Amino acid sequence: FTDSADIKATEAVNMLSALGVINGYTDGSFKPNDTVTRAEMAKMIYVLRTGSDKATAYENATTKFTDVKGHWAAPYIKYCEAMGIIAGKSATKFAPDVTVTGEETAKMLLVTIGYDATKAGLVGTAWAQKSTALATENGLLEDVDASLGLALPRQWAAQMIYNAVDADTVSYNADGQVVKTEKTENATVPYKSSTTKKYDLVNSSDAVLATYDSYTDAKKALDDGVVAGATKIVSRDEDVYTYVQETKTKNETVGEKYLDLHTSVGLLMTSGNETLNSSFSSGDDVLKINNAKSESDINEGTKSSFTKVKTDYTALLGQRVKVLYKDTDEVIGVY
């Protein structure tokens, strides 16, 4: 965005822009401090829950709100009304062009997570206080620098929705108690199993020219002049990984439930043709992270190789990153 220097919630804005949840303006700006209307928030939540900005199925849906007919956001408002996500300013007025507050946004996102507005106390005179408390409990307000009772700026709306993507979904058990929604998934997980010695032939600038599994082979190659420019042998330890199938049960996030979004955390080893370690080779449009598990390195997520990558992340090589990906292989962002 042309005004990216003014954006504080950078990661949230970048991710939601990539997902189409929140968009910039035709002049290339984002206008992070402009406020969000209730209609705009209804659309954002619709896209968050459906992965699409097409709401034609709701164009002719009925509504109790008399002030949304002919409004550009009417289908999104009708959807959110049907899902119990929104409430009106009165029994018949939604006020689509009025700015949305942080408290109202918190309530909408809590219902998106799975809370029942009535059961959770998000209605009545204390709805704002209860919404703020539950939003805090569920991490929706993390890194949000805004007064919740006032009109919500675009960048902080993005931050709240971004937090909701990572929030655990909830449901109600037979006793009416709130429980986290769980899902079971299978994955191939790399575990660090041992360490082996490698012997590199390097030149006078310490650039690696060749690698051998034994000192004897490396010494012979050096003495025989097999590798041009090699001046010495440097030994190093290289980790060996064993890949095993792992089944685990985890809480299902909003991003997983509605957008098939997942995250994997690890050390960025490869971006395109650039690689941090010669043992991690790559071609074009490849991203690889080392997320192997050891006693001192238990990571979130298990996927380590991605091929649908549109952005160059070479500048992050060697850093610990979180990869956000959609479906099974499409990288949305690396943070």
Q: Residue spans of the language-model regions?
A:
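OB-fold/S1-family single-stranded nucleic acid-binding modules
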Residues: 326-335
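Beta-strand/loop nucleic-acid-binding surfaces
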Residues: 286-311
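Extended alpha-solenoid helical-repeat scaffolds
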Residues: 265, 271-273, 283-284, 291-296
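Feature responds to low-complexity, polar/acidic, surface-exposed segments characteristic
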Residues: 1-10, 23-42, 46-74, 83-103, ...
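Short nucleic-acid-contacting surface segments enriched for D/E, G, S/T with interspersed K/R
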Residues: 305-323
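Mature N-terminal segment immediately following signal peptide/propeptide cleavage
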Residues: 13-22
